[in-house]
């Protein structure tokens, strides 16, 4: 696995992206040489490099929205190849819509774009097919040993088994408890104790050892783990691989050390200041652009009868500060007179207009005011009402380290409706975001949000 700034990224996903970049470059070169009116292709490319870079960025964005950087897909299947071809041409349409009405970007004409689009769609589909032929068998077979057959080790084993094709194949446990050695734990054998690692690793062809020990490590265990690196084997701790697999924090199996590191990281200060400036700028722009939509929504809500246009509810923000979140009212007036409760599917309290407004996410637009006031950000954990029953969730209160957002990591990775039962799981996603916060992770959330909205999946 790779870690680029704050984001865990699979090397297979990086390989897909690099392959697409090569396909795009080749498609441009092919188009320049096939275009009959082209006299000096390299000079033309140099003079219009910004235009070609912009077009390439649009292609990559559309492919991401189409979920075509999912390296677990088998692109040998005809429907997945058709999926690739469809979205490569959607990318072409997006280029035309964005740059070619009414004129053109740089000096890249429409005819040249057709040559490039045909070349790119054929190349990227061929690359995806080749990727699956070569890489699909390889990525299923990374054999691992789990050091620790206790709760943390079993927790990791369950996460791997729940994600077929994730790229990891547990071979067995290693544990220093003599009563466990030689037994079967959750269907996996305990092959020996930690002192046997130098023998077990080559014997079972193990390239990766995972230390799933939450208690204090003994001197013997520490010495055995150090020896792992001496025999050309990678050593990684359980929380890191669990984060990579699930996009969550294993709250029951981590210490408080990460939060101390977060607080002393000076780069976070500059990130938060720049993010505030971006939030402020974008909020002003979006308020201006969406003002007609806000007016129409307000009129439609008013047409259903009397009652306030906006729904205000107390939420807990950064550093525990309580604020009123602003939404368009989508329920009957007085729907929460008996106190707030979770919204269910087909909730009878939701009005006809409100149902449409919620489906299109238009009820979130007034939260631009919360962003202007500095109470929220575009991206961050969703603001929740104060609830004493949630304080028993490990690290729940750490959510207030950052500003709440309109969309967040929990919403794009766990897109089902929020209920009391799902809150602990969503908090794990929120904590992952806080621990790994950064612009790259924000960009990933933004792109995943666009994908969810485009395909109509819930938050």
Indicate where each model-derived feature is located.
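A solvent-exposed beta-alpha-beta segment
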Residues: 29, 34-36, 40, 131-248
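Signature of alpha-helical transmembrane segments in polytopic membrane proteins
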Residues: 1-140, 144, 168, 459
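Membrane-cytosol interface motif
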Residues: 84-88, 140-159, 308-331
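A short, structured surface patch at a secondary-structure boundary
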Residues: 343-404, 445-449, 453
């Amino acid at each position: 696995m790779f870690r680029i700034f704050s984001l865990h990224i699979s090397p297979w996903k990086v390989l897909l992206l690099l392959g697409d970049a090569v396909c795009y470059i080749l498609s441009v070169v092919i188009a320049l040489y096939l275009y009959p009116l082209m006299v000096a292709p390299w000079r033309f490319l140099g003079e219009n490099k910004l235009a070609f870079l912009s077009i390439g960025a649009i292609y990559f964005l559309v492919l991401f929205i189409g979920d075509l950087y999912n390296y677990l897909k088998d692109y040998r299947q005809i429907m997945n190849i058709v999926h690739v071809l469809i979205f490569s041409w959607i990318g072409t349409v997006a280029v035309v819509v964005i740059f070619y009405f009414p004129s053109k970007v740089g000096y890249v004409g429409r005819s040249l774009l057709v040559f490039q689009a045909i070349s790119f769609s054929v190349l990227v589909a061929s690359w995806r097919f080749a990727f699956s032929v070569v890489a699909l068998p390889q990525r299923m077979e990374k054999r691992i040993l789990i050091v620790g057959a206790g709760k943390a080790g079993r927790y990791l084993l369950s996460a791997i088994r729940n994600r077929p094709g994730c790229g990891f194949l547990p071979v067995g446990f290693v544990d220093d408890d003599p009563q466990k050695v030689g037994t079967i734990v959750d269907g996996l054998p305990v092959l020996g104790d930690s002192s046997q690692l130098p023998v077990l690793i080559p014997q079972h062809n193990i390239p990766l050892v995972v230390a799933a020990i939450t208690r204090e490590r003994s001197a013997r265990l520490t010495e055995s783990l150090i020896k792992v690196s001496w025999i050309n084997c990678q050593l990684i701790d359980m929380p890191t691989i669990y984060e990579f697999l699930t996009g969550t924090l294993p709250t029951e199996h981590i210490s408080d050390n990460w939060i101390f590191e977060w607080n002393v990281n000076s780069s976070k200060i500059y990130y938060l200041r720049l993010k505030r400036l971006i939030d402020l700028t974008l909020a002003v722009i979006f308020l201006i652009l969406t003002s007609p939509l806000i007016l129409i929504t307000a009129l439609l809500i008013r047409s259903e009868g009397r009652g306030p246009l906006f729904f205000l509810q107390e939420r807990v923000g950064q550093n525990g500060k309580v604020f009123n979140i602003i939404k368009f009212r989508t329920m009957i007036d007085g729907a929460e007179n008996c106190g707030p409760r979770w919204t269910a599917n087909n909730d009878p309290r939701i009005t006809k207009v409100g149902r449409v407004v919620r489906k299109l996410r238009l009820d979130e637009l007034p939260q631009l005011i919360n962003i202007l006031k500095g109470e929220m950000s575009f991206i961050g954990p969703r603001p929740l009402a104060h609830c004493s029953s949630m304080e028993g969730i490990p690290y729940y209160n750490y959510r207030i380290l950052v500003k709440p957002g309109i969309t967040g990591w929990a919403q794009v990775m766990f897109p089902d409706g929020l209920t009391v039962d799902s809150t602990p799981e969503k908090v794990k996603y929120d904590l992952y975001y806080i621990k790994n916060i950064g612009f790259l992770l924000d960009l990933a959330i933004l792109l995943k949000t666009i994908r969810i909205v485009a395909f109509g999946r819930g938050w």
